[in-house]
């Protein structure tokens, strides 16, 4: 979390001139480092699950304004699936993956139906809370998704918050 001092410093930069963008992608530049990190991130999933793990599957990627919107599609593709980006936004869209409103649930189901998706994935804005649906657009709750992930990873014990109530 940021402190009030951090917030003040951030706000102080709002009126500062933007640095010149040279478009330089030479080795060692920030963009090159970001591309390298993205490739390494996707490779980690390929190493864990194999390059054909999602072969033949159509996965919707509800992108909205999530910071993970591009990397999610990249990982699906790296795992052999077909990623279908949906609803990308350049303005902030608040998404609470644990309290999805009825209109959004209806939209998720419509995308799954209309695009013949096998699943749909997303995250909240800062990508620390995933969202997964089945082929009908029904959301797999986080307190179910966590133990499923733990099982896949071979965990023998799982601790969940007291608010985990759909298990």
What are these model-derived regions, one by one?
Residues 1-113:
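Gly/Ser/Thr-enriched, mixed-charge loops and adjacent short helices
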Residues 49-54, 111-115, 123-124, 131-133, ...:
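Solvent-exposed alpha-helices and their adjacent loops that cap or buttress functional pockets
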Residues 1, 72-73, 129-146:
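Short Gly/Thr/Asp-enriched flexible loops that form oxyanion-binding sites at enzyme active sites
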Residues 118-122, 158-159:
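Short glycine-aspartate micro-motif
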Residues 63, 124, 162:
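Conserved residues at beta->alpha junctions
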Residues 68-69, 128-130, 166-167:
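Flexible loop/turn segments at secondary-structure boundaries
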Residues 16-36, 136-167:
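Proline/glycine-rich low-complexity loops and linkers
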């Amino acid at each position: 979390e940021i402190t009030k001092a951090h917030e003040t410093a951030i706000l102080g930069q709002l009126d500062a001139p933007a640095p010149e963008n040279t478009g330089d992608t030479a080795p060692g530049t920030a963009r090159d480092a970001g591309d390298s990190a993205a490739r390494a991130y996707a490779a980690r999933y390929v190493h864990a699950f194999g390059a054909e793990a999602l072969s033949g599957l159509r996965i919707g990627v509800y992108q909205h304004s999530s910071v993970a919107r591009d990397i999610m599609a990249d990982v699906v593709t790296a795992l052999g699936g077909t990623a279908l980006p949906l609803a990308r936004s350049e303005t902030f869209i608040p998404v609470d993956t644990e309290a999805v409103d009825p209109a959004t649930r209806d939209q998720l189901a419509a995308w799954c139906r209309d695009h013949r998706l096998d699943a749909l994935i997303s995250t909240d804005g800062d990508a620390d809370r995933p969202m997964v649906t089945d082929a009908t657009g029904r959301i797999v709750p986080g307190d179910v998704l966590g133990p499923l992930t733990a099982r896949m990873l071979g965990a023998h014990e799982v601790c969940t918050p007291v608010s985990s109530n759909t298990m």
